[in-house]
Amino acid sequence: IKLYAKQRRLITLVTDQVYEKEKNNRIMVSILSKIVEFRNGESGLHVEHINKLSGMLLERLVQKTDKYHLTWTDQYLITVASALHDIGKIGIDEKILNKPGKLTPEEFELMKMHTMIGASMLERMEIYKEERLVQIACEICRWHHERYDGSGYPDGLKGEEIPIAAQVVSIVDVYDALTSPRVYKKAYSHEKAMEMILTGECGVFQPLLLDCFCDIQEEVRKVTQEKSEKEGKISGFELTDLKETLKNSHLIGDLKPEKNH
């Protein structure tokens, strides 16, 4: 009986520690991603939208195939890590991030560097770099702009050279970008966004993932509509005030990617 009680206490202790670690992971990821959102002039719901859609797409992918042998833990970590996909934008000039017009070729090349900056930031986290969450986040940061036909950046990866985590987030990120208003464009409708993605206007994605995304498009539409309704309730004053606070803080520095990235 004493042995059983001791085992129960140990199990409870380990469970509590795991829960606390995962909670802390989510808190830190949320803080970092919110900094990027507000600096980039976004509503604050961008990361929440990316999280939800990534989780939904992963769930459908696992239902449809066991090709990637994704466990529940894999799905959870990819979903959490998806929030950090654009963290490298911390190192991009705000004038480029929030430019109301089309970027020049030179500006676009600088913007593309956010993928390498984000990966470099995470790779420098010596204490945590062996953590699976950090490794997945690094993959997503660097490769969420790669395309299945090799036409993406920064490394021109093709097909299954692109980690599945990055492939999932790439579709979700494009959909979110299309259906969200930006300083340089209005939001596209769900229907138009789906058309653009499926016809390859935004690059080539893996056919299986496109099928999965089509399968869940009604759920995606609902989540996106809820996001739009929430955004309508956020005042411009609140967003401007938060951006000014972050601008004056010491959390945003001039980060440069390493030359070999």
Model segments located where?
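Histidine- and acidic-residue-rich, metal-dependent catalytic cores
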Residues: 23-261
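Amphipathic, heptad-repeat alpha-helical coiled-coil "signal-transmission/dimerization" linkers
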Residues: 1-18, 22-36
